[in-house]
């Protein structure tokens, strides 16, 4: 099975903040598969069901961000999972540009207090995670104020597409495994094809002479 945990803070006050993008993506995945958060256990709201033929539990910790590890450790014990292969944590990352997704099988917490809590209480950095870029704060901003602030209207308009892609990434992990998902999600976007143009000194194509094309740039 997979335990997929979205990180965030409970309550309407925080619902649309940058720090709650993990909540929103996991909720998007639940809505897509018509799973409802009807269970409460280990300080988390839980939706259980089947995705891509695999048993899954989707979790939204209710401990507030800095204590996320309490919920994750409790759920690990409840479901008897191996975090290295059956836990997937979804969270915001200020070290990635806005909207960029990155899948990793292990790693440090960086500046993220929720991840720091999970790593500390699990006693391991070895568990999969999906990081969602929210960009760095402006130089004069306090980090806490930034992550607890809302996205700009321009960013908010892009979020539905970003959350769809993030939910797609989670489905790929469940269906095909981390190796396939990482190759697909972490691959750089394809470079646009360079437009071909006729060399300025090439003969006109209407003539009987051969023409030549040169790459732009």
UniProtKB/Swiss-Prot annotation:
The keyword ATP-binding belongs to this UniProt entry's keyword annotation? no
Annotated binding of tRNA, by residue: 14, 64, 66, 113
Where exactly is the site Stabilizes the basic form of H active site to accept a proton?
A: 92
UniProt GO molecular function: peptidyl-tRNA hydrolase activity; tRNA binding
Q: Where in the cell is it found?
A: Cytoplasm
Tell me the keywords, alphabetical order.
Cytoplasm, Hydrolase, RNA-binding, tRNA-binding
Pfam families per record: Pept_tRNA_hydro
Q: What does this protein do?
A: Hydrolyzes ribosome-free peptidyl-tRNAs (with 1 or more amino acids incorporated), which drop off the ribosome during protein synthesis, or as a result of ribosome stalling.
In terms of NCBIfam families, this protein maps to: pth
Q: What is this protein called?
A: Peptidyl-tRNA hydrolase
Which organism is this protein's natural source? Roseiflexus sp. (strain RS-1)
Protein's gene: pth
């Amino acid at each position: 099975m997979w335990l997929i945990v979205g990180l965030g803070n409970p309550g309407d006050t925080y619902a649309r903040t940058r720090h709650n993008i993990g909540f929103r993506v996991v909720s998007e995945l639940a809505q897509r598969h018509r799973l409802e958060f009807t269970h409460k256990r280990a300080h988390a709201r839980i939706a259980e069901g089947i995705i891509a033929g695999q048993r899954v539990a989707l979790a939204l910790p209710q401990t507030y961000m800095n204590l996320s590890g309490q919920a994750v450790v409790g759920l690990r014990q409840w479901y008897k999972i191996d975090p290295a292969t059956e836990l997937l944590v979804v969270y915001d990352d200020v070290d990635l540009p806005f909207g960029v997704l990155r899948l990793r099988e292990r790693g440090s917490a960086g500046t993220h207090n929720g991840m720091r809590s999970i790593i500390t209480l699990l006693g391991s950095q070895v568990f999969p995670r999906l990081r969602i870029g929210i960009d760095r704060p402006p130089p004069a901003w306090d980090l806490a104020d930034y992550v607890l602030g809302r996205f700009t209207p321009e960013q908010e308009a892009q979020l539905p597409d970003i959350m769809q892609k993030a939910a797609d990434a989670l489905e790929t992990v469940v269906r095909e495994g981390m190796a396939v998902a990482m190759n697909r999600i972490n691959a750089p976007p394809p470079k646009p094809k360079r437009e071909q143009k006729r060399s300025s000194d090439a003969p006109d194509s209407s003539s009987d002479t051969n023409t030549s094309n040169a790459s732009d740039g």
